[in-house]
């Protein structure tokens, strides 16, 4: 009876040059996404009056009446407007303040 070995011979499987794995590529893409600033988006709603939204933009963000009115009109005509940007913590705080004032606001990474 012949002797049978169950162990395979050692094969040097090291590639000649380093290779990039998909996991490394994904990490780079995620890091680039995290480098983008966050923005606060205010959405149109059927409840708040236009002059109230203008007032809130002035009070919370220090916008002039003209700038606050411009942003309010953008919300009214386009359905949304970006009203602030910055770090995630800052934008989360801005969204919280807008919610406390009764406005519909969300946050997202800046698309530009």
Curated annotation (Swiss-Prot):
InterPro entries: ClpS, ClpS_core, Ribosomal_bL12_C/ClpS-like. It comes from the Bacteria. One of its GO terms (biological process) is protein catabolic process. SUPFAM superfamilies: ClpS-like (SSF54736). Involved in the modulation of the specificity of the ClpAP-mediated ATP-dependent protein degradation. Belongs to the ClpS family. Binds to the N-terminal domain of the chaperone ClpA. This is ATP-dependent Clp protease adapter protein ClpS. It comes from Rhodococcus jostii (strain RHA1).
């Amino acid at each position: 009876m012949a002797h049978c070995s169950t162990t395979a011979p050692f094969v040097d499987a090291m590639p000649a040059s380093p290779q990039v794995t998909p996991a490394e590529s994904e990490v780079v893409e995620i890091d680039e996404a995290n480098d983008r600033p966050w923005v606060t988006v205010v959405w149109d709603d059927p409840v708040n009056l236009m002059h109230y939204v203008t007032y809130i933009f002035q009070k919370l963000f220090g916008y002039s009446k003209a700038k606050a009115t411009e942003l309010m009109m953008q919300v009214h005509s386009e359905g949304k407007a970006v009203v602030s940007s910055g770090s995630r913590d800052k934008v989360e705080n801005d969204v919280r303040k807008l919610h406390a004032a009764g406005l519909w606001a969300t946050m997202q990474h800046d698309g530009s």
